[in-house]
Regions:
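Soluble extracytoplasmic regions of secretory-pathway and membrane proteins
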Residues: 1-5, 9-955, 959-964, 968-979
Length: 980
């Protein structure tokens, strides 16, 4: 019902049909093999035999006595069916490998060892291995059924030695059957060995993934030889069993050793020879070759195979078209240095998406039953004709915030969130709050000027409970819509968002599924009711496309008047020849995924091929899922399109508005930066030495404990001009420092990828996905992020002001440390937030730190801080130049809102009857945002008191030290009073 309502019923039927089909097919095959094997053994039953007798130390055990051939066949049928069903259930779990094998695609590139298209390894080889494993199990079942049945039917008679005498007898018919089964099993073993040869091309070694010199020149040839030996050994043993009279029981088991050796000479010599040859060829020869030939000349002998690994890795991870350039960065800030980077400077994002989430909640949550993601999203929107970096979040439903929890409220009244909230990425109000351009309840602002805008959020990451919606025409609405007046507005869901449960059968079904009898008896469930469940966007996409690996971040976008959740889907493989294997979970961990509940790393699994082949959207109102083929050149998604025809929309169907919000996904970028830290090196010899390997820096804004655990700095979305781009581009960025444990952290590279897909219907922007790498010279002394953070911390002026900000009941939070290639060098920008210790407090942007080389700027605005490090005039105006400007408009907006209705204005201030001028804090005196004379004096007094304290402590004058400390406390209290 759920899949049918979404229009993805083919997914469940194809998957279910394939799994059941494989299970039944394999169950029938293994049952048939077992039955045929047993039937042949029954047919070969000796005429005079009545079962088999086993004597153990004088005790007689009779097996199969008085069992007729007809009864034996019946027993064989039952046992073979049971075995078939058990093993068939294990085989059906690999349904995807079978489907991909029969729908394989060509990659158009060949592996460098065998010259076979890479599609064979990705699609066909896994299926062949599965089939050969199944065949091996079938043949093993055949020989087991044969031996057991022959024992039961008297074809094999065993007498355990008594006083040194025993007997082992196998009839001629039994020997023929067992010999044939043995040969077939050995042939299957040989075939598996041959298939295993191809797996060497994805074998993980100590340095690279793929076949190295020893593998190519020893292991692979030896494997073919051993496969031939295995097949020959099977023929020898099979023929010996069929023709030898030794097994007819003419001699006792405990005969003299010489006689036994003579009788069993052929199998003994054959097996012993095979073991010796195997040890020499598969163990000794590769070890000796590696030890005495390869290791002393490793760089020369491995270079060919390292180059194969480099080329394959860059191709498999989409790194073969990286635009790299040398960037001779300066560390001397000159006046006017940013004049040529004015557009990039104006777009520098100051709002940290993780730190400001509490601010969003405090200013825009409105009621306790709403919430926002703990890490808001970064996107871009055209506001008044200008592209703006934006922080955006959906106002989701949070049932945990309800005071009165019961079934009616949880499942029929509080059913949805309401609207999105968006703020400029580089602007704040005079008191440090985000400057919203979309906010409030009902929603108002720049994004919702559509005639039919739909703000209701029925489907979201936080919607974990099911909801029952819908009512007959004319019925009074009971769904709570949004707070207004004394009771709030109500609404009735009008979409097609879930299975209908109007009939008693559906109600009973879902009552059982959710363990709730209320679904059966509640009057809220009616003929028009729908049940909404599995409401997380990521969960919905995962169910309709279970073969995709989904990005750890889901973000909202306002598209054509509706709120859409955008989910990035990846096609992956672990079978691309010579490409380096990567743990996707480890590669995508960073400080954000470690601390956030709404952003996660990819699931831990090994892969050596990845593409962002699919973009999925989930409508926040009706939950409809749309899958779009994003990378049309990817053979893997082509295979899935063939398996599930009609499931995907083509690129041409993406609207211009939706296209403008498609961005380069973070998880893919993190995997690529992990690989590029080594694979920016294109020379095999240089790669072997490892002297130019890099690493992603740890996040210097995290605690010391987190840094010791190597929690990496996340990538950041920024609009900037870099690496040969002709104009500023919305990009995803990161940086590199030298690999290893050196304490000298300098910047070695700056990585960015163009993330703007454009805004043309059905056409991806020409530069989208272009990866740009700016490599710094080896003698560069540009500080890395960690060193830049240390420079901030070591600055006496910065420390002094931060100490003042942290006094009393406030604390300082450092925002994301951004790295930007500006002014001929690298500029570091870090917003500084101040938060009081109250339970309802929230961070406010108060200061901005800037570093260029070893120079540090610290001011109320980015504009001022940039001027400090660039000779008093940076030559460009940052986007926050007006952040300390007049707040008259803010106050007027606040006055115009209806405080009794709990509305919020687009500048972010929640109205209350006692605060009609819209202020929520900040300096109540000077509205221009400049420091008042009294505040300057208080700060100067505090600074002087600190100097007096230091001087007194050095002299050991503790009385004077106590007086200075008292004066310091008084000055700080005065400063705090003036600042509030």
């Amino acid at each position: 019902m759920w899949y049918s309502q979404l229009g993805f019923q083919s997914v469940i039927w194809t998957q279910l049909g394939t799994r059941v089909g494989l299970w039944l097919a394999y169950a029938v095959l293994i049952a048939a093999v077992g039955f045929i094997s047993a039937t042949l053994a029954i047919w070969a039953r000796p005429d005079a035999a009545d079962g088999s007798t086993i004597r153990v130390n004088g005790d007689t055990i009779e097996i199969g006595k008085s069992v007729s051939s007809k009864s034996a066949r019946r027993i064989a049928v039952v046992i073979s069916l049971i075995v078939g069903l058990v093993f068939g259930s294990q085989f059906n779990a690999n349904w995807s490998e079978i489907l991909l094998m029969f729908n394989s695609q060509s990659f158009g590139t060949k592996d460098p060892q065998f010259g076979i298209d890479n599609g064979f390894y990705v699609f066909v080889l896994p299926g062949l291995k599965l089939i050969m494993s199944a065949v091996s199990l079938l043949l093993l079942a055949g020989i087991i059924f044969s031996i057991v049945t022959h024992v039961l039917m008297g074809g094999i008679r065993i007498t355990i030695p008594v006083n040194g005498h025993g007997l082992f007898h196998i009839t001629k018919r039994a020997r023929r059957q067992i010999g044939i089964w043995l040969m077939l099993n050995m042939f299957a073993w040989a075939a598996n060995q041959v298939l295993g040869v191809f797996s060497h091309l994805t074998e993980e070694g100590s340095r690279i993934t793929g076949a190295t010199y020893t593998t190519v020149n020893a292991t692979i040839p030896v494997t073919f030889i051993m496969a031939a030996i295995t097949a020959i050994l099977g023929v020898i043993l099979g023929l010996w069993i069929m023709k030898s009279h030794t097994l007819e029981g003419s001699a006792p088991i405990a005969a003299r050793a010489s006689e036994a050796l003579k009788a069993w000479k052929v199998p003994t010599v054959a097996i012993a020879s095979a073991i010796v040859v195997s040890l020499v060829l598969t163990v000794a020869w590769p070890v000796l070759l590696q030890r005495f030939r390869v290791n002393p000349n490793a760089q020369e002998m491995e270079s060919t195979y390292i180059q194969r690994n480099i080329d394959a890795t860059r191709a498999a991870y989409g790194l073969d078209k990286v635009k790299a350039e040398q960037y001779k960065a300066t560390t001397e800030g000159e006046e006017g240095a940013l004049a040529d980077s004015a557009e990039s400077t104006a777009q520098i994002r100051l709002l940290d998406p993780q730190i400001i989430s509490p601010t969003f909640k405090q200013l825009q949550q409105s009621k306790q039953y709403y919430t926002f993601a703990d890490t808001v999203a970064v996107d871009k929107y055209d506001v008044d004709g200008v592209s703006q970096d934006t922080v955006i979040a959906a106002r989701e439903l949070d049932l945990d915030g309800l005071d009165n929890r019961n079934w009616v409220n949880d499942h029929t009244v509080y059913t949805h969130g309401y609207g999105v909230v968006a703020a400029y990425g580089n602007k704040v109000t005079a008191d440090g709050q985000p400057k919203f351009f979309e906010a409030g309840i009902p929603t108002q602002g720049k994004l919702t000027d559509y005639e039919k805008y739909e703000p209701r959020i029925y489907f979201s990451p936080n919607a974990t409970e099911y909801s029952i919606v819908g009512a007959p025409e004319g019925t009074k609405s009971w769904e709570f819509d949004y707070p207004t007046g004394s009771e709030g507005a109500t609404n009735t869901f009008k979409g097609d968002g879930g299975p209908k449960i109007g009939n008693i059968f559906s109600r009973l079904l879902y009552a059982i599924r959710f363990g709730s009898d209320q679904i059966l008896f509640s009057n809220r469930v009616n003929s028009n009711s729908q049940i909404l469940y599995d409401r997380s966007p990521k969960e919905r996409v995962a169910k309709v496309a279970p073969y995709l690996t989904l990005d750890g971040r889901v973000y909202p976008a306002v598209v054509d008047g509706r709120v859409k959740w955008i989910v990035d889907g990846y096609t992956t493989s672990d079978a691309y020849p010579y490409s380096q294997m990567t743990d996707l979970g480890e590669a995508t961990k960073d400080s954000t995924t470690e601390s956030s509940d709404t952003v996660s790393s990819l699931n831990s699994k090994n892969a050596n091929y990845i593409r962002n082949s699919v973009k999925a959207t989930v409508d926040a109102y009706d939950g409809s899922v749309d899958l779009y083929v994003w990378d049309q050149s990817d053979p893997v998604v082509k295979a899935w399109e063939k398996i599930f025809p009609g499931q995907y929309h083509q690129l041409s169907e993406i609207s211009g508005d939706l296209m403008s919000h498609m961005r380069y996904p973070e998880s893919l970028f993190k995997v690529q930066r992990e690989l590029l830290a080594k694979y920016h090196v294109s020379s095999a010899n240089q790669f072997f030495s490892g002297e130019d390997f890099w690493q992603t820096p740890v996040d210097p804004t995290e605690s010391q404990q987190a840094q010791q655990r190597d929690i990496l700095q996340p990538p950041y979305y920024l609009t900037l001009q870099t690496g040969g781009s002709s104009e500023p581009v919305f990009s995803l960025t990161s940086s590199y420092i030298p690999a290893g444990s050196s304490t000298r952290e300098i910047l070695t590279g700056f990585l960015s990828v163009d993330s703007d897909a454009g805004h043309e219907k059905g056409k991806i922007g020409s530069s989208y996905g272009t990866i740009r790498l700016q490599e710094l010279p080896k003698d560069s002394n540009v500080p890395g992020p960690g060193q830049a953070q240390n420079n901030f911390n070591a600055s006496a002026d910065v420390s002094k002001e931060l100490n003042l900000l942290e006094s009393g009941s406030t604390n300082v939070q450092r925002g994301n440390l951004l790295t930007l290639p500006l002014g001929g060098g690298l500029v570091y920008v870090q917003p500084v937030y101040v938060k009081s210790s109250g339970s309802t407090s929230f961070p406010l942007l108060k200061k901005v730190l800037v570093a260029f080389g070893d120079q540090v700027g610290f001011a109320d605005t980015l504009d001022e801080a940039l001027d400090q490090v660039f000779g008093g005039d940076s030559g460009a105006s940052a986007g926050d130049a007006e952040n300390v400007g007049d707040t008259t408009d803010d106050k007027q907006d606040a006055k115009n809102d209806d405080s009794a209705d709990g509305k919020t204005n687009t500048d972010g201030k929640q109205d209350t009857p006692s605060n009609t001028d819209g202020k929520t804090g900040g300096n109540n005196g000077d509205s221009s945002g400049t420091m008042s004379a009294d505040l300057k004096k208080a700060l100067a007094d505090a600074a002087q008191a600190m100097k007096d304290s230091d001087a007194a402590m050095k002299k050991g004058d503790w009385s004077a030290y106590g007086d200075a400390q008292k004066q310091l406390q008084e000055a700080l209290n005065k400063a705090i009073e003036l600042e509030q």
